[in-house]
Amino acid sequence: MNDFTMNDLMGLLPYAPIIAVVITVLVVMIAITMKRSHMVTGTISVVGLNIGLFILLGQMAGIIDSGSLVPAAEQLFVIDNFAQFNMVIIFICALACCTLSYAYLADLKDHKEELYLLMLLSTVGALLMVCAQHLASFFMSLEMLSIPLYGMLSYTYMRTRSLESGLKYLVLSATASATLLMGMAFIYAEVGSLAFKPISLTLADTFESPLLILGAAMMMFGIAFKLSAAPFHIWTPDVYEGAPAPIATYLASVSKVAMMALAVRFLIDTSLLALPSVQMLLMVMATLSILLGNLLAVRQTSLKRLLGYSSIAHMGYVLIVIVSIGSAADSISSMYMAIYAFTSIGAFGVVTLMSSPYRLSGEADELTHYQGLFWRRPVLTAVMTIMMLSLAGIPLTAGFITKLFAILAAVQGTNWFLAAMIILGSAIGLFYYLRVLLTLFKRPKQFIEFDVSKQWGLRTGGIMVIAVTAIIVFFGVLPNSMIEWASLARIW
């Protein structure tokens, strides 16, 4: 009996980083029931995430024993290099969102502590998503990520737009989840398995099955919604605009990284990428995402909506990587999503630092709110400038390296049309990213509606924003270190 118990405990070692976050959730719940304290709750959340991150890094370095999964868990989850790489990114992004939330909620008089609880619960779902290798764990972890987001998006419910964004995401996300379930049912009916690898083994006998193609298409529709890929992108700008700034940051970083990692593993492990119909569907989604995302962003006057449309275009670039090089897309897609997530944290972080949850008129999301920011806050302007240049793919930023790899992936797959689409999309994107930069350096308005404190760089959120800016510049100047780092993200 003791041996059995010890084996069970050893089988939980690979999950130690996730268990650390689960324990943090319990501690936060107890802390809230004992005495409400924003500082205590925020500190516990950050400490718990740091512990999980350090355990994960220790396991990757071989310092901490990572054990082996119990047989029952092996059917649902896998802890490989790909999962560990994306878990590191999720931990870093969740830490950034927690610290930005602390600064954002400082002036909120209502309950602040529950936001950390929801964010930690959602992070557990995200961590499980990148490890899922079974359709049951696929759906379970996805819902663990999504359900807390409904409350997080509506957290500043005193603002109509925030409440609207939460309700809109709830309704549309539920529809996407139902579509995913239906697709899973069709695939199971055809191949008789919910595990990714057995689906791949039976694919040769059911290659042209209409039921399999329909199931794969329905699953791709659900995945496209979660990724904000066209034509399932309509919700993105509205939800980004209405969401509290730190939650928009979370949606653009943690949620996107987890969903893309799950999608890549699903497509590679099941070999569904071998289906010509799936390849064509991905190509259409990628093309529409790049064109619609960039063209619609050109007309935006809201920075948050602009970043929302920008995210649609960037998901298109990653889809091109997946459809072009197939099973080799794991490391490049992970690298692209990591840099995109860090850039989103920097851009939305500036919005968060300048916003207040109690302004019924909204947050600092209009471009006019940033007019002349350079003359008041030059360092903050430098942060936003670097983020915009990285999103545009300008040299000496990490965004340039990832976009270059996306083009090279399309060329390697001889998808010349898709390579041209990346170049065209980048050219269009350059216009609206530079428009943001011109606004920052214009002559300031006489009346300043939104501003940040002079000591913003010493606050927790400000430190995190500066840190991700340094990462973007470092990997842009020394890309070899980023490439070596991303090469670890391989699916076994």
UniProtKB/Swiss-Prot annotation:
EC number: 7.1.1.-
PANTHER family assigned: NADH DEHYDROGENASE
Gene Ontology, cellular component aspect: plasma membrane
Cellular localisation: Cell inner membrane
Role played: NDH-1 shuttles electrons from NADH, via FMN and iron-sulfur (Fe-S) centers, to quinones in the respiratory chain. The immediate electron acceptor for the enzyme in this species is believed to be ubiquinone. Couples the redox reaction to proton translocation (for every two electrons transferred, four hydrogen ions are translocated across the cytoplasmic membrane), and thus conserves the redox energy in a proton gradient.
Chain segments annotated as transmembrane: 12-32, 44-64, 76-96, 115-135, 138-158, 169-189, 212-232, 244-264, 272-292, 306-326, 334-354, 381-401, 416-438, 463-483
Gene: nuoN
EC primary class: translocase
Lineage: Bacteria, Pseudomonadati, Pseudomonadota, Gammaproteobacteria, Moraxellales
Stated name of the protein: NADH-quinone oxidoreductase subunit N
Self-association state and partner proteins as the record states: NDH-1 is composed of 14 different subunits. Subunits NuoA, H, J, K, L, M, N constitute the membrane sector of the complex.
Keyword Cell wall biogenesis/degradation: no
Topology term for the membrane: Multi-pass membrane protein
Keyword Transmembrane: yes
